[in-house]
Amino acid sequence: MAEQIYTIPVNDAFDSECECPMCQMQRELERNAIEYTMGPSYMEDDNRAMTDKLGFCSHHLRLLYQEKNRLGLALMMNTHMNKTIKDMKELAAKGPAAKAGLFGKSTPNAPIVDYIESMEKSCFICGRIDNMFVRYVDTIFHMWKKDTEFREKFADSRGFCTYHYG
């Protein structure tokens, strides 16, 4: 099967001398996502809106701090924090959730608690990686079905880590 643009990252991972090609693809996706985030994209309105909304997990924030473009990170974090503070003030002004009576069902979380929990679980970079990784997995299955050369490459690989094997 002729190599297509969508098969290149998968072939590169299976060609590399690594213990787990899936981990290799994730590392490459993470490296690309960090470079994309810290590149000129941080000045684009749609990307800035996404980073303002999603923010970054602690792992990826640490990696962003290690990059050279500190001004770009400062701009992203400034607009993200301004949006977060504005959203939290609006939610705090609404007040706590109504309490149930003595024998009532448990009350739902206050909206501000739900907002904070959702912010802790969101990350712009994790989202980019997950979105692309699903496509890579689909590509692996497609190539395994259609490409005998890839099937041999797959069989000759060292296998997968326990995380990706499961």
Residue locations for each model-derived region?
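Intrinsically disordered, low-complexity regulatory regions of eukaryotic proteins
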Residues: 1-166
